[in-house]
Amino acid sequence: MAEDKISAAVLDRLYATVQARKGADPETSYTAKLFHRGTAKIAQKVGEEAVETVIEAVRGDKAAMASESADLLYHLMVLWADAGLEPAAVWEKLAQREGTSGIAEKNARKS
C-alpha cells in the first residue's frame, strides 16, 4: 500500500534527522537540547506526549490526537537514538508479533 511506504519513509527520515542533530548546538536545535538534558528528560517528554495523546483520544479530537501522536513519535525516536536503539529493532519485534494473538503473545513473554 502506498500510504504504508510513505509512512515508513517519513519515520526513517525523522530518525535520520534525530541522529544528525545529536551533536548539534543545543542553543539552536531542540533535538540537541533534549540530548544535552539527558535520558531522564527525554523519557519525561515521551511520557508527557503519551498522556497528551491519550487525552485527545478521550476527547475525540482526531486532529489534535494526530498532532500529539506526531509529537509522541518524535520524542520516542529521540529516546531510541539516545539509547542507541535502531528503529529496525522495534520493527523486527512488531514483525515477530504480527499474526499472533495479543493474549498468546503476552503469555509467551511471561514464560
UniProtKB/Swiss-Prot annotation:
Organism listed in the record: Azospirillum brasilense
GO terms for MF: ATP binding; phosphoribosyl-ATP diphosphatase activity
Enzyme class, spelled out: hydrolase
Pathway the protein acts in: Amino-acid biosynthesis; L-histidine biosynthesis; L-histidine from 5-phospho-alpha-D-ribose 1-diphosphate: step 2/9
Name of this chain's protein: Phosphoribosyl-ATP pyrophosphatase
Keywords: Amino-acid biosynthesis, ATP-binding, Cytoplasm, Histidine biosynthesis, Hydrolase, Nucleotide-binding
GO BP annotations listed: L-histidine biosynthetic process
Location of this chain's protein in the cell: Cytoplasm
E.C. code: 3.6.1.31
GO cellular component: cytoplasm
Family from the record: Belongs to the PRA-PH family.
Family matches, as NCBIfam families: histidine_hisI, PRK00400.1-3, PRK00400.1-5
Reactions mediated catalytically: 1-(5-phospho-beta-D-ribosyl)-ATP + H2O = 1-(5-phospho-beta-D-ribosyl)-5'-AMP + diphosphate + H(+)
Domain of life: Bacteria
Coiled coil (residue ranges): none
